[in-house]
A protein has these predicted regions:
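A glycine-rich dinucleotide-binding beta-alpha-beta segment and adjacent secondary-structure elements
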Residues: 217-231, 398-404, 459, 463-528
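Helical element adjacent to the flavin cofactor pocket in flavoenzyme catalytic cores
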Residues: 244-299
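C-terminal segments that line or cap access tunnels to active or ligand-binding sites in enzymes
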Residues: 360-479
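A conserved FAD-binding loop/helix module that cradles the flavin
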Residues: 526-545
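Mid-domain catalytic core of redox enzymes
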Residues: 256, 286-415, 562
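Active-site-proximal substrate-binding core of FAD-dependent oxidoreductases
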Residues: 290, 547-565
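N-terminal glycine-rich phosphate/pyrophosphate-binding loop and immediately adjacent elements
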Residues: 38-172, 498-499
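Rossmann-like flavin
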Residues: 134-238
Length: 565
């Protein structure tokens, strides 16, 4: 099947009429934006423009559904948004993306949605896309699993057998995760048990327990545990299966979207608009409209903060679990079971985010496009003990943190010849809760003083990698968990949705299809987090809403391939 193409003036590729045998062809007569805004009914309303919601929106619009996305922020993308400060561009939620190699899952989704040709990704330093910075040395993690294993053995020769055994188990569990994704019944579960017992018997055990089984060297344990920051749970708590999923995601290296994280929602929104879909910014949903009672409950649309009602056959919430169930749905429409479940739900970790612009000579410092995991002590769990401390001290060294030189990843982001950096430290929302009722930009002097003290602590940590940074700053701005609440509407400033603990993954995840007919849920509070995880939940939501197969949602790869540079 060949599609005619219309090329819009904004250089976003606009394919012609999408097709599927299961659903109707979109009308040839395109409606104007003004007419679309006057429509009484949509097929699907998506609440929130995070990457999961946009994935579902594009998938459904490709299949002929009329989709409206409503976003409370003035920037689309949720944690994949980018913003500017004094002309410098920052992307707080995306620092690298994996599985963009041929056959990679992330690539499959972007290309399958028909937006591959609109995206270019830049490879992080292949000989060290992640740098683990100790006080006395730096260990570089290279792209390619076998290269990584060989480098570990070279650095820790006495741990050779443990390293080999550990990665053998990781490969087995990774294979089991692939199989587990296709489980549909008891026979599939039995097949998984028989063919991949490694995941059955190890998947829910704490990652640190598995690592301790194979490894004795404290520094090596740190290297194997430190990227827990990519899922935000202590190695002592995170299920090994999730730890493997995150590690395996980057076995072939990492990439960064050219133009910043916002390039991804931009491509998806361009496709959505070409399919007669629409996104409305600064549009806050007050609540979801539900008709009927008991088993007859059905979502029929939304009511906005200004009182306007918009009707739709289906509503998909891309908001987090607490916003969705505690704020958008009237309690009388929820069962006691789901109400109790939400009340016990644990949010993921929060963080401080430091955004910098500097006139330092980055070349002279030898900094590259890789990420820097800075460890002041070898105990990775100390990072998470700090994050659980509601009495966050204003002074002292952070046990660990994360730094990225974003203009090294994408030189097109340079402004006025300055380099930009982003740094992050996990902290507790509780330490900032006393200021939660104050307005952003109008908070008290003690809040601003606390921020300044924390900024200095972070700069001291960063100076291990970037000496004299504090004397070469042209821009320095700190975001707190309250910033996360304001811009991303995340419960208690969480950055990964629900905590992916033993009780909240696998069978414990919140469902895509809710107990209310016509109401669905996707994003980081459901099955998975991160760019790929959230997109995967969007694909699952589109499948269930359209009642179609996975390959039908991702049937548009011929529209173009991702460029890797």
């Amino acid at each position: 099947m060949h599609y005619s193409r219309k090329w819009p003036t904004n250089n976003v590729r606009c394919p012609g009429t999408p097709y599927t045998a299961k659903l109707r062809v979109i009308k040839n007569q395109r409606q104007t934006t003004e007419q679309r805004k006057d429509m009484v009914n949509w097929d699907v309303i998506v609440i929130g423009s995070g990457i999961g919601g946009l994935t579902a929106a594009v998938g459904l619009s490709n299949l002929g559904k009329r989709v409206l996305v409503l976003e409370q922020h003035y920037l689309p993308g949720g944690w994949t948004h980018s913003f500017s400060l004094e002309g410098h561009k920052f992307s707080p939620g995306v620092h690298y993306v994996g599985q963009l190699n041929e056959g990679g899952r992330t690539r499959e989704i972007f290309e399958g949605l028909g937006v591959g040709g609109d995206l270019e990704f830049l490879e992080l330093h292949p000989d060290g896309y992640d740098h683990i910075v100790f006080k006395d040395e730096t260990f570089d993690i290279p792209a390619g699993l076998e290269k990584y294993i060989a480098r570990l053995i070279e650095r820790f020769p006495d741990e050779r057998s443990g390293i080999v055994g550990y990665f053998k188990l990781m490969k087995q569990v990774d294979r089991g995760l692939t199989m587990a994704a296709d489980i549909k019944g008891i026979f599939d579960k039995l097949k998984l048990l028989l063919t991949c017992p490694a995941i059955v018997f190890n998947g829910l055990k704490p990652a640190s327990q598995i690592i301790d089984r194979f490894i004795t060297d404290a520094k090596l344990k740190t290297i194997l545990e430190v990227r827990a920051g990519d899922h935000g749970m202590s190695p002592a708590r995170v299920p090994f299966a999730l730890h493997v999923a995150i590690e395996a995601h980057y076995w072939n290296g990492g990439w960064y979207p050219k133009g910043g994280a916002s390039a991804m929602p931009k491509a998806l929104i361009g496709r959505l608009k070409c399919n007669d879909g629409e996104i409305r910014m600064r549009t806050t949903v007050d609540h979801i409209l539900v008709d009927g009672n008991g088993a007859d409950r059905r979502a029929v649309g939304v009511q906005l903060a200004d009182g306007k009602q918009i009707r739709a056959e289906t509503v998909l919430s891309n908001a987090d679990a607490w916003i969705t169930y505690d704020k958008l749905i009237d309690r009388r429409h929820l069962s006691d079971a789901i109400t109790s479940r939400i009340s016990k739900l644990e949010p993921s970790i929060s963080a401080l985010s430091l955004f910098l612009a500097t006139d330092l000579d980055i070349d002279a410092l030898g900094l590259d496009s890789g990420n820097y995991w800075i460890m002041n002590e070898a105990d990775v769990d100390a990072t998470y003990r700090l994050a659980e401390d509601g009495q966050l001290a204003a002074e002292g060294a952070f046990p660990g943190g994360f730094l990225t030189v974003t203009t090294r990843k994408d030189e097109s982001k340079m402004h006025d010849g300055l380099h930009t950096m982003e740094a992050f430290v996990f902290v507790s929302y509780t330490a900032f809760e006393r200021w939660k009722e104050s307005a952003t930009g109008d908070r008290s002097e003690d809040y601003e003083a606390f921020k300044e003290q924390l900024t200095q602590r972070m700069l001291k940590m960063i100076s291990r990698v970037v000496p004299n940074i504090e004397n070469h700053l042209k821009l320095c701005e700190l975001g707190t968990p309250l910033t996360n609440v304001f811009y991303c509407n995340g419960h208690r400033g969480n950055i990964y949705g629900t905590a992916k603990s033993k009780s909240q993954i696998g069978a414990g995840v919140l469902p895509i299809k809710t107990e209310i007919t016509g109401l669905y849920h996707c994003g980081q509070s459901t099955a998975a987090h991160g760019v790929l995880g959230a997109m995967a939940t969007g694909v699952m939501a589109a499948q269930q809403i359209a009642n179609c197969r996975h390959d039908e949602v991702l049937a548009f790869a011929e529209e173009g391939k991702i460029t890797l540079s």
